[in-house]
Amino acid sequence: MSEAEKKASQDAQHKEPMADSETQLDSDSAPSSQAEKPAKTKYPLSFWLAFGALCLTGLISAMEGSIVSTSLPSIIAELKAAFQPLYGQLADLWGRRYVMILATAIFLLGSGICGGANSMDMLIWGRAVQGIGAGGINMLVDLIICDLVPMRERGNFIGLLFLFVSIGTTSGPIIGGALTDNTTWRWVFYINLPMGGAALVLLVLFLQVKWKKELSTRDRLKRIDVVGNAILVGATFSILYALTYGGTRYPWSAANIVAPFVLGFVGLGIFIAWESNKRWCPYPVMPLHHFNSRTASASFFISFMTMILAFWVVYFYPVYFQSVLGNTPTISGVHLLPFEVSFPIFAAVGGGLVSKTGRYKPIHMVATSIVTIAIGASSVLTQHTHKAAWAVLQIFIGMGLGSLISTTLQAVQAGLPESETAASTATWAYMRSLGTIWGVSVPAAIFNNRFDQLSGQLDPSIRDNFVRGQAYEHATAQFVQSFEPATREVVIGAYTDALRRVWLVSIAFGAVTVLSTLFEKELTLRTELDSEFGLAEKKGDAKGDVERGEGQNDSREGGQNENV
């Protein structure tokens, strides 16, 4: 047996027993070791340079997601979800540095194709390439932070990263509008090239991290789960297609919506069967034993629901501002600032609390409860509601969702060994990305269905403008204000009623998320970094670049395992 084959056998044996030898911890109290505040890790300049490059790359990717006109098919942009597990597998085989540089280069290539597009087909293909690159960036920045920072302290840096991501998300529409008004639409894409180019240079110069080089290229290629990735991409694409066009371009009952839905979920079933077969799939792209841990499973679900509820707010508060209050898109964006500002602030606060206390379950329970109450209370908003009411509600929603976004990854990884960081981060990113498209499609379906029920109140001469998914498309102040006063009041009343249904249904989604936190256990967050992909060591420095404080726990034995 060759050395590579021996290594492969050892790796496979190392991963399988994880979920069966779990040490059960009290779910209601933190382990005693967490009560002691660990020594603060000191990070060298090389770490901060690498972290700065990651933040800039994350900012550009986030800005791309909000700068581009929503008229482009969202299925293209959301295709990135399907490739994130593959990026995780590639990062384990070829190291984080090269895969991160590759993802950034793919993103820039897609931006260049879009900017130079001379047809809609070329633009759509460019967006597909750009989205695949963005998906890798979004997953890899979190993964690399996990490689460079002990688990106990990751919340601090993930929260800081989300500050940059939120800057990109918030500034995107403003920059996009300014570029479109003063130059050409092509600069909406070209602007990524100088900024992304600078980020790429920083990554090449400062992202100097270790990686395993003992395998040959041939052995690495054998470890790529080609079949599993292909099935997952196909199944994800089918579901995204149905969610994107169902209720808008086609009725939900149409065969060309039902068929992709069925094929997508059948595909996911086949994917699960493939990944669980050790003979066919010795190196799964998404190890299913991660879901044997009830804490990891609950945290994956909370991550998915967090993004659903976040996009629920991001897409339907503007509908309220424009169709009910009569705000312009610009003013609507300003009115969304309480959420957009509170979200990253509390992402940093939530991450900091986990780092300080070593506990994530209480934060998840409180945060999900706050979100459920605040998003449900949005159902009382009307044309005459004082602006302080919707501003405060947004702040509370941002408080809850922000606290969740920066703390669920630690809960996922607490019961897993460090060797599975890439796979668990990729699965976490995949769940979050899926949540974004469900977070638009589900409330849109509820909204349009309710508006169809209310269409009988409208004058027959205008009714066709609001049925079969058109109510959401026409939710603009310009359109609503175009009617005479009496008709306008009826239309505004219908929008208010449809939005009320959207917010009331959101309570059920929030309540399920609250209940899911009860399945989490409070596992110890490791305070010592033990990664094979940390900062590259300097010559003569066996300890590497990161200076560690005294009294840190050894994590080389892998993650804690909990009895399910």
UniProtKB/Swiss-Prot annotation:
Biased composition (Basic and acidic residues): 1-18
Pfam families membership: MFS_1 (PF07690)
Organism: Aspergillus flavipes
Residue ranges that the Swiss-Prot or TrEMBL entry lists as coiled coil: none
Family: Belongs to the major facilitator superfamily.
Ranges where the record places region Disordered: 1-37, 540-564
Paired cysteines (S-S): none
Protein name: MFS-type efflux transporter ffsH
InterPro entries: MFS, MFS_dom, MFS_trans_sf
Subcellular location: Cell membrane
Stored PANTHER family: MAJOR FACILITATOR SUPERFAMILY, MAJOR FACILITATOR SUPERFAMILY (MFS) PROFILE DOMAIN-CONTAINING PROTEIN
SUPFAM superfamilies: MFS general substrate transporter
Protein function: MFS-type efflux transporter; part of the gene cluster that mediates the biosynthesis of the cytotoxic leucine-containing cytochalasans, including aspochalasin C, aspochalasin E, TMC-169, flavichalasine F, aspergillin PZ, aspochalasin M and flavichalasine G. FfsH might be involved in the excretion of cytochalasans.
Database matches in PROSITE patterns: MFS (PS50850)
Membrane-related topology note: Multi-pass membrane protein
Glycosylation sites per record: 182, 553
Transmembrane segments: 43-63, 98-118, 131-151, 157-177, 187-207, 226-246, 254-274, 300-320, 334-354, 362-382, 389-409, 427-447, 502-522
